[in-house]
């Protein structure tokens, strides 16, 4: 029976059993194993080498180095046993220890060799020969020594006299040399003494010459003032002659209707009034006849003309207000504190007067303590010149003239008025001058009273051929006064130019607009652009009347100085002229050589650092000298000796105003008064709104205080401060200022990220596990598993209908399978043993095996039946089709109207299911707020190579494409990977921003508009973030803003009230812009130069402002900023003594006071500070270089732009000295003897020579212990007559 037949019988048996359900049938089955079919020799099995496993295992022996044959193994074991046995023996003997004895084999002994007689003889001969050789050497050596001693003895005897002669000659030569050296030293000492005496005589002569030059300068200043007074007197005398005064009008008019001057004239001479009254009475009695009609008409015309003339001339002298110059009033107030009888006259001289010396015409109530009053009205007294006697008795006496008796009283009155005019200065009150200049008809504007006086002052300068400085405070209209001057020259003098106006780059457009507005009749050339454009503008450069005014910048005039230098200018006007304060700079040297008839300097701060800068301006005005006799204004050394050094001592040492200091101040005023006009806004513009300054102290935040204390307490910082290195100290100061402004400027808040590891630890550890995991991932075992069979895929049944699924469940035959399986289990004998090849149990065992196989097959069929019949979908295809057939939402009008009438129609559509199913993007959007608030935990470390380890089977192209897709979880993953600092910490990390927040809320809510100034560009970025956080609208202006954009931003801020804040850089927003739309100025930090802050605040507090201006200065408490503010207040002391706007000297503040900005307690640091006080200090150039090195790159660039435009451009206005090779022969007072006599050496050379003389004097005192005797006097007189060694 074959295998197929047996299978058929089995199937038939099974079916029969199912049908009959009987088990009595017995079947005997015999199986025969078929023979293998051999088709190849390889199919024949070989005979086994070993019969069984034990024989195979006994065929080899496994050792450490591999498997061996049993015989080889025995030999190896035997050798190993012998080796270990020897090792044990050596160990017992101690050979393996360090103390083991080492036994050396002895050399074979030669005792067995016999010694013969000949050997003894030869050894004796060798010993005797060695002994004789040694004796011979000893005797030869002894003989050489003896012979040498004998030769030396006889040589000494033969050369004794010659040696003695040589020694004597050597001694004489040495003595002569020393004597000559002493004589030469003595002559050098005498020569130094002669030079010292010559230097003293030269210094005395120079001092005398300097006094004479100062006297000449003072005399010239006095002459200029007297010349102006004479011209004013002539005009007044011509206008107030006897014929011009209508005494009838004065007598008949009530005193209430007359002005002060008319009352003065009316009651100045009672005798003249009585004579006029008597003449009128005589005329009334004599003139009784009536006049003809023609005579009446002529008389009416004469009366009308006389009345008009009287009104015009009376209006010219209606009121005379006594206004003294600001410097004079400040001096008077200062002197009044010391003594009541110290008075300053117009020329600044101090006159000590007694009370009884003052004329009786002056009221006793007019005491000198009234010097603080701005107006001194003329009193109704018998002599109007008494007030001038109060100020200057000598000047008043000089002005008395001989007049006839009839006009004595009237001329006394006129002289009093003219003398009083000598002390008048404009201050904004209505002043009408006798020689008032009419506004030119070309000028399209209106001048205020003080501007009218400024025009008259400028005109007087031009008429006297004198150059001057218009130093009005910023915002008083220096530009419009200059334009009016040029219009006056064109109208009255027929002088149409050409005029050159040099201005900072930032205000070029402003000057052009002012000219077009107020003087449209002039042709204006605005010189700017690239080199090609400037070349085109120079076409017709030397043709007359091509244009009248050329406006250019400091930078361009230096670049194209050749064409400007060759052209002849009528007026050269420099705006912001304090930028030529350094006479060593190339800018000063170039502009000095320009061919200009007149020069005018416009500046709001004539003094910024020291009086040397003022000398630079004055010398620039008068390079040819104040008079024809003098070749220059004054050399620098003399000017410093006259004014600078006394003022420095006065300010630095805090001395009181003694008579010597008062005299120095008065002389300085006399020198400056003819050339300088200075008015303050508070003095000339009474309607100007008030200005209030507030200092707001801000506490440092916790982070600021930590960074500040940490930096100042570092060992490195203490070393730098103790070393005294200027650049390093400035750098430390800048770092502390950054901490005070905002801690992020010093140290940014870190952005926390996870530490990224390129290689994970799992890549190096558990290699076997990693290989297995890689193999499984590579083979993709999930593809070999039928998950649907295991019913793990629940969505495979969604294609079934729910009704079909129910039918399939009803066809499940689980119960039938259970009955058959129960029957088969009953037939199986569990206790049946395996077949033992016996006929008795083979049948039972075979039958039991058949039943077991049938049972297993039945169970498998049961499982398949249940699996196939139990497929039930989650939703079913019928439900899905129903959902797809639901009506969609309609947006038509009919649907909307119908739904309005029948709300139930809206039930056909629903968004409930749609809202339950959210996409990844929608879920990320809904959880955005939660993610932003709570996704804040950043892991300490992440591994980069994990995706590569577990995604080897994914192609790289696919990974790249997936990475380019927009990841909705990118924000969440980023927040978990990177922790950014909260933006609100920007405010809470800084004490100034917290104060600024409260301040802005109050100001903006009350309708104020704010200007915020800062020095650092990075602070502007922080302020922008701060304003954006709080939602304030703002504008920004810094050094990078173009000139055209500045004007647009300025006009937009002034015209748009919806922009409450304007943030600016002090170095760019402090010049050339008008921001009167703001009434509040906030200085976030203070600049190094207080004048820049003053310029910045005057952008708002100027003419045109209608509201009071409040200035807030934010200062960090207990920091270097507090010390800087204290120093700035001390620097403003000089303003009260010289002129408004002065400061301390640079040498006093620059280096020595830098250490004062730190709160130093250590003794070492105090010692360094004392050394720096005694040593030389840094000049302004080193100061600026140090600041440039310490500041940030953006701030350095902004500073360069600031210097370029007078606080806008560092490149142009940095005080760099000009190399000597660049200076022309006549371009500098340092290089031309004819230009500046006595100026051959600058201050540095003078100081070095002085130091040399001091050293010579000290050496002289050391060399000469005794006093100078008659021989010394003879030597001194000889050298004085014959000259020193360098003169031979």
UniProtKB/Swiss-Prot annotation:
Its main location: nucleus. ATP binds at residues 472-479. Residues 459-624 form the Helicase ATP-binding domain. Residues 278-305, 1252-1266 have a biased composition (Acidic residues). Keywords: Activator, ATP-binding, Chromatin regulator, DNA-binding, Helicase, Hydrolase, Nucleotide-binding, Nucleus, Transcription, Transcription regulation. GO terms for cellular component: nucleus; Swr1 complex. Its EC number is 3.6.4.12. SMART domains: DEXDc, HELICc. Residues 105-177 form the HSA domain. Residues 310-326 have a biased composition (Basic residues). It catalyses: ATP + H2O = ADP + phosphate + H(+). Pfam families: Helicase_C, HSA, SNF2-rel_dom. GO terms for molecular function: ATP binding; ATP hydrolysis activity; ATP-dependent H2AZ histone chaperone activity; DNA binding; helicase activity; histone binding. Residues 275-326, 362-384, 1204-1288 are annotated as: Disordered. Residues 1208-1235 have a biased composition (Polar residues). Residues 995-1150 form the Helicase C-terminal domain. InterPro entries: Helicase_ATP-bd, Helicase_C-like, HSA_dom, INO80/SWR1_helicase, P-loop_NTPase, SNF2-like_sf, SNF2/RAD54-like_C, SNF2_N. A motif (DEAH box) lies at residues 575-578. GO terms for biological process: chromatin remodeling; transcription initiation-coupled chromatin remodeling. Catalytic component of the SWR1 complex which mediates the ATP-dependent exchange of histone H2A for the H2A variant HZT1 leading to transcriptional regulation of selected genes by chromatin remodeling. Belongs to the SNF2/RAD54 helicase family. SWR1 subfamily. This is Helicase swr1.
